[in-house]
Amino acid sequence: MASKIGSRRWMLQLIMQLGSVLLTRCPFWGCFSQLMLYAERAEARRKPDIPVPYLYFDMGAAVLCASFMSFGVKRRWFALGAALQLAISTYTAYIGGYVHYGDWLKVRMYSRTVAIIGGFLVLASGAGELYRRKPRSRSLQSTGQVFLGIYLICVAYSLQHSKEDRLAYLNHLPGGELMVQLFFVLYGVLALAFLSGYYVTLAAQILAVLLPPVMLLIDGNVSYWHNTRRVEFWNQMKLLGESVGIFGAAVILATDG
């Protein structure tokens, strides 16, 4: 009996570490995909989302925070720093107005950013640590969960009001309209759980099971988004990487919530 409990605990710790790896490495992929995206825009003489002098500082801060988080050095502080950096970066890009996106694409982009910020706040609370030397900050974790709940509300909203998202689910998932409505209900229920703070571990477990097929069939269908919906290739790759980071945050809450 004791060996079964020990093996189960070891497996949960292994899965939790996997979630931490996916979330803490997310900024590296974000910086790489941004560089590739802005290089493509430079060839077409189009501007990046953030002016170039500030862009280098922004990416430097992201890489610095991601590096320290990855090595586990002052992870809580640098997770908080990563959340702050991402929030400032997104706000700067939004008010800059250098690039104009469709409303449906803005929802896809900014909702994922909100979720990643929430994931970093969960990490900053002390969740996902193998050997916790300090008590966990429940306020930071609750705030991170609220951010994840907001992301799920945005996804549910897009399923009902975004033609692009609805067609992605209708064309690439079996079950047609029934499956779309099922996902809508699931996202809504999970959002309520994260926002209210009740059954968070169970909600995170369901989300961790739900996200991989969605990432593979919806976000991973680059040809649909790039060729049909005219989303820039590296922008879609950035969104896909953020979905992986959100999955990592869900795994952390599912195993250490």
Curated annotation (Swiss-Prot):
Q: Give the signal peptide, or none.
A: none
Keyword vocabulary terms for this entry: Membrane, Transmembrane, Transmembrane helix
What are the record's GO terms for cellular component?
Answer: membrane
What membrane topology does this protein have? Multi-pass membrane protein
PANTHER family, per the entry: TRANSMEMBRANE PROTEIN 101
Please indicate if the UniProt record lists Cytoplasm as a keyword: no
Question: Sorted alphabetically, which InterPro entries does this protein's record hold?
Answer: TMEM101 (IPR029371)
Its biological function?
May activate NF-kappa-B signaling pathways.
Q: List residues traversing the bilayer.
A: 24-40, 52-72, 77-97, 110-130, 139-159, 182-202, 206-226, 233-253
Query: What species does this protein belong to?
Result: Mus musculus
Compartment(s) where it occurs, according to its Swiss-Prot or TrEMBL record? Membrane
For the keyword Membrane, the answer is yes
Superkingdom of origin organism: Eukaryota
Protein name in UniProt: Transmembrane protein 101
Q: Where does the UniProt entry say this protein principally localizes?
A: membrane
